[in-house]
Amino acid sequence: MMDVKSISVRVDGTEIQARAGATILDILNENGIEYPQICHVPEVDPIQTCDTCIVEANGKLVRSCATVAENGMSIDLSGNRVKEAQTEAMDRLLENHLLYCTVCDNNNGNCTLHNTAEMMGIEHQKYPYTPKEDPSCAVDMSHPFYRYDPNQCIACGQCVEVCQNLQVNETLSIDWERERPRVIWDEGVPINESSCVSCGQCVTVCPCNALMEKSMLGQAGFMTGIKEDVMEPMIDLVKNVEPGYGSIFAISEVEAAMRETRTKKTKTVCTFCGVGCSFEVWTKGRDILKIQPVSDAPVNAISTCVKGKFGWDFVNSKERITKPLIRKNGAFVESSWEEALDLVASRLGSIKEQYGKGSVGFISSSKITNEENYVIQKLARQVFETNNVDNCSRYCQSPATDGLFRTVGMGGDAGTIKDIAKAGLVIIVGANPAEGHPVLATRVKRAHKLHGQKLIVADLRKNEMAERSDLFISPKQGTDQVWLMAVTKYMIDQGWHDQAFIDENVNYFEDYKETLKTYTLDYAERITGLSKENIIQIAEMIRDADGTCVLWGMGVTQNTGGSDTSAAISNLLLATGNYRRPGAGAYPLRGHNNVQGACDMGTLPGWLPGYQHITDDKARAKFEEAYGVEIDGKPGLDNIQMLHAIEEGKMKAMYLVGEDMALVDSNANHVHDILSSLDFFVVQDIFLSRTAQYADVVLPATPSLEKDGTFTNTERRVQRLYQALPTLGDAKPDWWIIQEVANRLGANWNYSHPSDIFSEMASLSPLFAKASYEVLEGWNSFLWGSFTGESTPLLYEDGFNFPDKKARFALSDWTEPAAFPEEYDLHINNGRMLEHFHEGNMTNKSKGIQAKVPNVFVEISPELAQERGVCDGSLVRLVSPFGAVKLNALITDRVRKNELYLPMNSTDKESAINFLTGPAADKRTNTPAYKQTKVRMEVLGGCETAPLPKTNPRNKKRHPQNGVEAERKWNRPGYVHLTD
């Protein structure tokens, strides 16, 4: 009896077993049958514009991409009717496209139009090519990163479909009502004046050369970059001489093969946010030609954001440090590696000997690889015998991790981004993934737009996700825990909780109900400013949803009660049975490409690699045997405690890698004073950051494109990155530098490649026991989560990470926000902008990004602006008890009343947010309460030019539609259908 999940079809007379529900084209592709499909994008629904995929199914001509196969179906791929229809379809496309493949910038072996024409044996065109628009002015070069040539556009609609329904940025469409249809941006404006957010998805999927990265123009080919007045006669000459396209294609194939000899394509993992996008980087020498995502990428597939696609100029920036620097007589002097490393080792070693093991501290990095983080904690624990090691998760994610450890036993995402996309309801609290985690946000936007997913957003600011949501709530700052607990209490009171799940899986329910007694609807309304009706509506939406995922970020964690609010999120999910199942669970959005990995590798004062606690005697003994030293069973100092220890004179030296502590720590004025007081300070970085300016020695490291290694994303997914470029100047990978320092202090390490380091780490860490470079080869990945070492996409399938396998309700009350004197009457929020990454040390090296966002500014509500006499461009000074900044105002309804918003992408003392923030911190983890800052405002100047250019997409309106709307093409006057 045939499996109901499979069907049988006949393809050109051959019987094939196939998936039930698969389209005919799916079956062809899954069985390796090469077939035309110019407009097909596997990641989206069938586009149905090119008609090159037509087949005959049970005697009818149909589009194979949109026709679901039926059991017993007879499919003909080679009959005369099929071939005639396909040829007509291709002729209609080629009428819109001039074939000049040999001199084309896109002749790189991956041009779908070229390859399909060759596959089909096309020799001549039925319809001669004619341009749609005046060639002298048709090409839109307005955008900093890519260009569009309508006269090469075949109107296949791939770019439109992905913009509308995969990225869901909703900028592109095809004007099917034109005499000659073409792609348009918004209402037909130049690209750079549109709502385009520069994700580059359109360029990635374009099957020809209509959309091209500007960085590719004239760069890839041996015969590209030829001027128009020479190129056009060459094209005409070739067409007149050659008897058909076959000969022309043969020449272009030779040229494409020549390109392969100098164009290197290397798989890498993005170095910006925590989503973990992977893609190919195309290089020629040290030139980065383009970023090309592929369907095999496990997280993003073909998607990117502006930074991942276009934000790599920093790699070749002239501001890179390429030689070691030693401070002599108050100024930096270039030195040799020998001199610099000898000095670092001797000074750090002598300080340890003179002042003791606790006199040296280590700050690791969320930007460097897992392997490099591992050797940094090993340097601290083995060579310096100290647990004084931490990373930037202290500034952001430690409270989320703490809340999860207390409730479910593991500090990571419950599932994957695919689970988020599957959820019936997504709740986003204190996060702005459309700007901070853009590719992850696309999956939520797509599920919400097309698949009925519901969306709740809780934020002080009306960001893009709030605009799209079914319910947007804006509670008073620092009160998220109150409404979360009120929702939980209300659901329990109504009997909407999952009692069976709780009985089987969770401890302390009765104690938890006692804790909830205070959190009535009336209490929550008074504290949060939300209406009781909103709180009830949230409860009802959770009740009705088939799976709830909660995503949260710095708006939760960077508060005095960040850990307890994170625990409250987990409590709500436990009470409603939203763990241990797909499409549900807790998702703290990790901010950096490898902040998850930095923690996983043990660069934490209380944790050894693989989340083995420093107080665990057995775990510690294992590392002691491997390292040959005794490891202190007491946690070391975290980032914040290290600064206190420096101030108190107890810590004399610090070794900091890939972190701009002088800008990212709170109360920056005070931090600067502290760093200046160190006896010896080593900074390892790719730029002379603000922090590096306080160093005694600066060691030049390499960015991700110049080394091998692994990163771990927000899903707990480990992925390999491969060296794409040679190191610049004398810069070295961080793992090499650390090993050289360690060996000068007697360590005798002998790592020859990061794979050696990974193997050692995995041998000591059960979570990674079955991970290896072989497992991670190519596009493969590994998700930690099982102490028997298996890859674990969904956590807790075998129970929660406690001895009895049961989770625990956290019993925590709300902590009030930090108090400020009355004169500080405005609350100032902060966060990322889409175009920039954090303080901008990398993205501010990109001319294109800087053109989109040239300045930092403060967002002010229309109400406050009217009250205080502020307009766009007004110069204002913001003053807190801890410092002051001066910058221009941007009036926007994204903020309301007395709320201000200051993007964090500034390295300037005049405008960086942390010259305002103070010492308040999360009570459990010491994470600074960056979000609890109040200021007063002084208006210094009148109306000037708005600090956000008119060409920034925030000033534009989106144009949503459901994909390409191919029906409009079919309804054009005179359109002749090729299907039956």
UniProtKB/Swiss-Prot annotation:
Residues 144-171, 187-216 form the 4Fe-4S ferredoxin-type domain. This is Putative formate dehydrogenase YrhE. Residues 81-121 form the 4Fe-4S His(Cys)3-ligated-type domain. SMART domains: Molybdop_Fe4S4, NADH-G_4Fe-4S_3. [4Fe-4S] cluster 2 binds at C153, C156, C159, C206. InterPro entries: 2Fe-2S_ferredoxin-like_sf, 2Fe-2S_ferredoxin-type, 4Fe4S_Fe-S-bd, 4Fe4S_Fe_S_CS, Asp_de-COase-like_dom_sf, Formate_Dh-H_N, Formate_DH_asu, MoPterin_dinucl-bd_dom. One of its GO terms (biological process) is respiratory electron transport chain. The keyword Iron-sulfur applies. It is an enzyme of class 1 (oxidoreductase). It holds the Pfam family Fer2_4. Residues 5-81 form the 2Fe-2S ferredoxin-type domain. It catalyses: formate + NAD(+) = CO2 + NADH. In the C-terminal section; belongs to the prokaryotic molybdopterin-containing oxidoreductase family. Residues 944-980 are annotated as: Disordered. PROSITE patterns: 2FE2S_FER_2 (PS51085), 4FE4S_FER_1 (PS00198), 4FE4S_FER_2 (PS51379), 4FE4S_HC3 (PS51839), 4FE4S_MOW_BIS_MGD (PS51669). Residues 263-319 form the 4Fe-4S Mo/W bis-MGD-type domain. Keywords: 2Fe-2S, 4Fe-4S, Iron, Iron-sulfur, Metal-binding, Molybdenum, NAD, Oxidoreductase, Repeat. Residues 258-980 are annotated as: Formate dehydrogenase. [4Fe-4S] cluster 3 binds at C163, C196, C199, C202. [4Fe-4S] cluster 1 binds at H97, C101, C104, C111. It comes from Bacillus subtilis (strain 168). Its EC number is 1.17.1.9. [2Fe-2S] cluster binds at C39, C50, C53, C65. Its cofactor is [2Fe-2S] cluster; [4Fe-4S] cluster; Mo-bis(molybdopterin guanine dinucleotide). The lineage of its organism: Bacteria, Bacillati, Bacillota, Bacilli, Bacillales. [4Fe-4S] cluster 4 binds at C270, C273, C277, C305. GO terms for cellular component: membrane. GO terms for molecular function: 2 iron, 2 sulfur cluster binding; 4 iron, 4 sulfur cluster binding; formate dehydrogenase (NAD+) activity; metal ion binding; molybdopterin cofactor binding.
